[in-house]
Amino acid sequence: MADLRITGADQFAAVAKELKKVGDKELQKELYSAINRATKPMRAEAKKSAAANLPKAGGLNKRVARARMSTRRRTGKNPGVKVVATGMSQLGLMDKGRVRHPVWGNRGRWVNQPIPDAEGWFTKPMEDGATDVRREIVKTLDRIAKKLARRY
């Protein structure tokens, strides 16, 4: 749903490739846990945003706030870090300010309902926190690159 492109993507790819090549599981773990730590505040802000901005009637805001949010990292040809919300359908649609649901009393008929207050409930916290996450990841990459240079 949200994709953070770190400015040091080439550096991320190079460090990740080197870590795989030398097989240093300790440094890999350090890198991945640093990425998870860096994105944790953004995930928490997205949950708060869901609780505050999505419709409270029917408990939609609480159900979405309980959705699983995880950090995924790619180290192949397109390196990057992605924060993803899963566990419920229509999360992306809700982020665009809409929800699709059956009509009360006629479950066979579905409608698209606008929820303008919900627009950006996920992307806004991601965009707001992206700079801090990038900075933290680049610092971690520098630290790990130095450790790799000393060890190998």
What kind of feature is each model-predicted range?
Residues 75-103:
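Mid-chain, well-packed structural core segment of small domains
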